[in-house]
Design a protein with these regions (language model features):
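SH3/SH3-like (including bacterial SH3b) beta-barrel domains
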Residues: 245-259, 297-322
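Active-site neighborhood of divalent metal-dependent phosphoester bond hydrolases
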Residues: 39-127
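Residue-level detector of conserved catalytic or cofactor/ligand-binding positions
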Residues: 340-348
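SH3/SH3-like beta-barrel fold
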Residues: 273-278, 314, 327-331
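Acidic, His/Gly-enriched loop-helix segments that form or flank divalent-metal centers
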Residues: 103-200, 207-211, 230-234
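Active-site environment of divalent metal-dependent phosphoester hydrolases
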Residues: 2-6, 31-34, 60-64, 176-185, ...
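N-terminal active-site segment of His-dependent metallophosphoesterases
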Residues: 1-42
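Binuclear metal-dependent phosphoesterase catalytic core
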Residues: 196-250
C-alpha cells in the first residue's frame, strides 16, 4: 500500500470487501506515499475487526527502528535526503519545523517519535507471519527449511527473490515485498503470480516503488472444498481511445529493470538512443526522455520496455505518458510505445 490510502480504499470497494471477509495486509503500508499517517490510522481501525490481520513489512520495521533506536538517529538525515521523498518521517519533520537546523539528530528523533507515539506503538507490535488453514502469509519469504519460524528476521522481511528460491512446506506461501514485474525478464507486468507447483503466490504490484504500478488484491474462495483464486487491482491511469489504426511489425521484447539500470549509449538518435545493458547483455533502443547521466554514467530512469504496440481505431488504452510523437501505453495488458493518436481522457 505504501501510504496510498486512496488506492487502497478504491481496491477494497472494487472487491466489495465486507467485515465478514478475512482481510490480510502483508506489510509495507507505510512510507513512499503521500498519505502515510492517514493510512496507518485507517489500518489501525481495520485491525480492530476480528477477521483483519496486519503483518509487519520491512518498511514498518525500519520506521520503528529509525525512530526508537538512539544509535540510528544520525541516519534520519540521510533517510530524508536519499531514501524517501515523502512518508511520515518527512511529513512530521516539516510539521514540527525541524528543518531549521537548531536540533541535534537525537532531538529530532525524539520529537518525531513522540509525535508518532501511537502509530509506532501499533506497528512495533505487528506479527511477522500468519498461518491460516493451508496458507502461510509473510511479507518477503521464508528460508528453505521445514522449521520456517526459525528463519531470520531479515529473510522474513527482506528476502529479494523468494519466488526463485522456493520453500519446503506443504502450505501455499503468500508474499509481497518484491514487485512481481521484477520476475518477468522481458515484459512489464504487475499482475499477481500464482504458482501451484511451487506453492508460492506473489502479490506486490509495485505501488509506491515503480512508476508503472498497481495495487493488487488476491481473492481466495473455497467452494465445495476446492480453493479458487482470483485477482483485482487498482491502477489509476487515464483511459484514452485510439483515433486511428497503428500497425507495427512485432519486435523482440527487451526490458530494463531493477537493479540493472546502467546502460552504455552506443548511438544517440533524435528520439531514441541505441543502448547496451551489460548485466543482461541486451541491446535496445531507449526513448531519450528515459535516459539521464550521473557521475559520468548513463542510466535508465525506471523499468522500460522497447516493445512497440499496434492498435485499432476505437481501442481503449491506458496512457502512462506522452513523449514527443510517442505514447507510452498499456494495451490489452501489454506495456509499450506506440505512434498512436489518442482522444481526450475518457471515463471507463
Amino acid at each position: 500500500i505504501h501510504g496510498h490510502l486512496d488506492r487502497f480504499q478504491a481496491l477494497l470497494k472494487k472487491v466489495k470487501y465486507t467485515p465478514e471477509d478475512y482481510l490480510i495486509i502483508l506489510g509495507d503500508f507505510v512510507e513512499k506515499g503521500d498519505q502515510v499517517i492517514e493510512t496507518i490510522h485507517y489500518v489501525q481501525e481495520l485491525s480492530k475487526r476480528d477477521r483483519v490481520f496486519v503483518l509487519m513489512g520491512n518498511c514498518e520495521w525500519a520506521l520503528d527502528a529509525l525512530l526508537t533506536i538512539p544509535e540510528l538517529a544520525n541516519q534520519i538525515q540521510g533517510y530524508l535526503k536519499r531514501v524517501s521523498s515523502n512518508g511520515c518521517i518527512r511529513e512530521v519533520y516539516h510539521r514540527l519545523h525541524l528543518d531549521q537546523g537548531h536540533e541535534t539528530m537525537l532531538g529530532i528523533q525524539k520529537q518525531i517519535a513522540d509525535y508518532l507515539h501511537d502509530e509506532i506503538a501499533f506497528i512495533s507490535h505487528l506479527p511477522v507471519t500468519l498461518k491460516l488453514n493451508q496458507f502461510l502469509f509473510v511479507h518477503a519469504g521464508i528460508e528453505k527449511r521445514k522449521d520456517y519460524k526459525n528463519s531470520s528476521l531479515s529473510s522474513l522481511l527482506e528476502m529479494k527473490y523468494f519466488y526463485h528460491q522456493g520453500h519446503l512446506l506443504d502450505d501455499m506461501v503468500i508474499v509481497g515485498h518484491l514487485p512481481t514485474s521484477n520476475y518477468y525478464p522481458n515484459q512489464i507486468c504487475n499482475d499477481i503470480i500464482i504458482d501451484e507447483k511451487k506453492k508460492i503466490i506473489c502479490i506486490d504490484g509495485g505501488t509506491g516503488v515503480k512508476s508503472i504500478s498497481q495495487l493488487n488484491a488476491l481473492i481466495i474462495e473455497s467452494k465445495d472444498g476446492v480453493i479458487h483464486y482470483s485477482q483485482e487491482y487498482v491502477q489509476p491511469l487515464p483511459y484514452h481511445h485510439v483515433i486511428s489504426d497503428v500497425e507495427i511489425s512485432q519486435n523482440e521484447k527487451h526490458k530494463i529493470a531493477y537493479p540493472h539500470f546502467e546502460v552504455e549509449v552506443i548511438k544517440k538518435g533524435e528520439e531514441f538512443s541505441e543502448c547496451y545493458q551489460k548485466e543482461t547483455q541486451q541491446y535496445l533502443k531507449i526513448k531519450n526522455e528515459f535516459l539521464y547521466k550521473r557521475h559520468h554514467q548513463t542510466y535508465c530512469l525506471d523499468d522500460y520496455t522497447d516493445y512497440f504496440i499496434s492498435a485499432k481505431k476505437g481501442d481503449l488504452v491506458k496512457v502512462i505518458g506522452i513523449y514527443s510523437h510517442y505514447a507510452y501505453v498499456i494495451h490489452q495488458g501489454e506495456v509499450g510505445l506506440s505512434l498512436i493518436h489518442i482522444s481526450e481522457p475518457t471515463r471507463h
